[in-house]
Amino acid sequence: MTARRNNSVEQARQAAIEVLLHNLHGPYHGLPRTAGWGYPEPYTRDLLIAGLGALACGHPKLTESLRRVLETLARNQTHHGHIPSLVHDREDRGASDTTPLFLLLLAMYRRVAGEPDFLESPAVRALTWMDYQAPSDHVMVAQLPTSDWRD
């Protein structure tokens, strides 16, 4: 890679980190906001996808923020393991991708943090919920019209 491209990549990386840091404190229970200049709500899908960037850059404030998001999701998880669509609202359910995203980011966070048992009980409940989302028992989770994306 040329020096010019290297510089462009580094500038993009720094800009992304600045956005993530800007979004650290939103108006809902000290959780990050979804979009710094748009949606203040802590949408699970968006924050977990942003969590990939938080873990990749290794910034301690971003890693700690992801931990808070995961802990809040675990507290707001349904008895059967479904993860809500809004991090802070246990009644906002219906998304089919929030629970698998929770499991993915939880596994990655555990590895980065060196905490293999972090949120073990919520992880087991989430896996149980996932099992019941595969009607044919062939591991593949169903995407039914009633559990479709709402945006």
Model-flagged regions — what are they?
Residues 41-47, 54-144:
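Aromatic-rich carbohydrate-recognition surfaces in CAZymes
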Residues 35-36, 49-52:
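Short alpha-helical segments and helix-capping/turn motifs at coil-helix boundaries
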Residues 146-151:
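A short, charged helix-loop
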